[in-house]
Amino acid sequence: MIKNKILTATLAVGLIAPLANPFIEISKAENKIEDIGQGAEIIKRTQDITSKRLAITQNIQFDFVKDKKYNKDALVVKMQGFISSRTTYSDLKKYPYIKRMIWPFQYNISLKTKDSNVDLINYLPKNKIDSADVSQKLGYNIGGNFQSAPSIGGSGSFNYSKTISYNQKNYVTEVESQNSKGVKWGVKANSFVTPNGQVSAYDQYLFAQDPTGPAARDYFVPDNQLPPLIQSGFNPSFITTLSHEKGKGDKSEFEITYGRNMDTTYAYVTRHRLAVDRKHDAFKNRNVTVKYEVNWKTHEVKIKSITPK
C-alpha cells in the first residue's frame, strides 16, 4: 500500500547555483512512502540529471529502508537513465580519403563511497551475463534480509522488491571490480552476426564494407546490421544495496558514474582492395560522475557536483 504522501522536493538555491550550466539539466525529485508491513516503510527519492555535453542521463532511485527490526540503515539505489552511443562517421581532416567510424565498445556504470560507516551488501547484476535481455530481482524481508532472484519471475515472497531489466544485444555484462565500498560494471561488445557469419567484437574488419558511395557512412554497414547499443545507446538498469551504521553520521556521499569507451575503425580504398585499421579504446572513459549526498535521518538526497561540468 502506497500512502498518499507525494511531495515535490526542489534543490536548494545554494546547490543549484554552482551547477548552473547550459550543458547540464537537473529535474525535480518526486518523493513517495510505501508501507511494507510490520511498521516498516520504504521512503523513495528520485533524482534526474543530464549532461548534454556527453549525452548522458542519470535517473537514480534512492529507496531508504526504514525497519525497526533491522539494526542498520539500508539504502537501495537503482541506477537507470540513458547513455547515448555517440556513434559517428567522418572523413579524417588531413587525409579525407580515410573514413572513420567511432563507436562504443563498452558502457561504464559504477557506484562508490568513501564513507567508513557504509558498506555495499548486495548488487545486481552479478557475475558475467551474456544474454541479450537481462532481468533480475532484489527482494527484502523484514529484519534486514536482502536476497536476489535470477529473474523477475523468480520464486520467493518479499515484503519489498526491486527489479532490473535491460537489453544488451551483442554485448555482455561483466563485474569489473567490487568491494565493500563500491562496484563497477562494464557492458562490453561481444560478437555480431554479419552476412559472413558470427564475428568477434575484436575483429579488425568489423562494420567495414566495400563503399557504396563517396561519403564516410558508405564505408560501413547499414543501420539494419547494427544493434541498438551502437545505433542509439544503452539504457542501464543496475542496483546496489548499502548498509549504514545507525548513529554514526547523518550524511553519506556516493559517486555514480556512467560513460563509454569508444573504438575507432578506419577504412579506405587502395588500388586493389578495402583497407581497414582498428584502434581499440581510442577514446576511453568518456564518463560523467555525479556526487550525491544522502541524509540518513531526513531521507533527503542532494546533488553535490557533476564532473565534467
From Swiss-Prot:
One of its GO terms (molecular function) is toxin activity. InterPro entries: Bi-component_toxin_staph (IPR003963), Leukocidin/Hemolysin_toxin (IPR016183), Leukocidin/porin_MspA_sf (IPR036435). GO terms for biological process: cytolysis in another organism. Keywords: Cytolysis, Hemolysis, Secreted, Signal, Toxin, Virulence. One of its GO terms (cellular component) is extracellular region. Toxicity requires sequential binding and synergistic association of a class S and a class F component which form heterooligomeric complexes. HlgA (class S) associates with HlgB (class F) thus forming an AB toxin in strains producing both gamma-hemolysins and leukocidins. HlgA and LukF-PV can also form a complex. It is found in: Secreted. It comes from the Bacteria. Gene3D superfamilies: Leukocidin/porin MspA. It comes from Staphylococcus aureus (strain MRSA252). Toxin that seems to act by forming pores in the membrane of the cell. Has a hemolytic and a leucotoxic activity. The keyword Signal applies. This is Gamma-hemolysin component A. Residues 1-29 form the signal peptide. Belongs to the aerolysin family.
